[in-house]
Amino acid sequence: MWKDNRISEVFIKKKGIGMIALADIPANTLIMKELPISIVKINNQTVSDIFQILYDVLSDPNKKSLFEKFLPNSINEFESHRNNLMKEFHKLKKSRLNNVYQFINNNFTSDEILLYGAKYMCNAFEFNNGSAILINGAKFNHSCVPNVIFVSDENYMYFYTVRNIKTGEELTDNYVDIMSNTKTRKNRLFNQYGFDCQCERCIGSDKLFYQEVEKIQSSKFYFSNQISVNHRKKLQQNSKNLKKNPKKTIKATPK
């Protein structure tokens, strides 16, 4: 994991852990690059992305220790998810993931399973065609007008500023689709993440932020495209090197 020394993790009143700028940071700056601790690809072979990741994390003591620090620490706001979550969990018993079912069922209570499920729902990232857990990326709080966007390649998640950031300003990304309307965003945030969004856009008007949101989406598309281009160039260069030195194995890594 690489992090710009101008950003820092702090405690923010009414929010908990968050990220702030220790100095002015220009727009379009890469401020963090992180390798997920767990990834699952979602395709027609996927049985349950949530429990596949939970198994990977909870069966590894080091990953489990990091994951348990995530919020929430209580299941009070997530009781409405219990039935659906446990229904999905019990389906594993008769699937090819029976080993996942047996491990979780033998080691954790239903309340613990719900809590770990809530931690997943509140902290997992979409990652290519799947889901991922990032320890530091999860520390950014949400805004419907974020000043940070995140994009991924095959291995890493990259975090960029989308406008000039002032010293002391909180750095935020988005948990839901910022192109959706206020009602849709607030419902999704409350149902999945357990909070009522009070960002400047949610207490104001979507119309006032339309151009800014469009610009943020354009920035995300631009950086995603740039990372894809750089990754392809890296792979092409490695392929050329392999042809020149066929006995030498070169591992493709993102720039």
Swiss-Prot record:
UniProt keyword Signal present: no
SUPFAM superfamilies in alphabetical order: SET domain
Keyword Metal-binding tagged: no
Pfam families cross-referenced by the UniProt entry: SET
Residue ranges occupied by any SET domain in the UniProt entry: 5-176
One example GO MF annotation: methyltransferase activity
GO biological process annotation, one example: methylation
Disulfide linkage: none
Name of the protein in its database record: Putative SET domain-containing protein L678
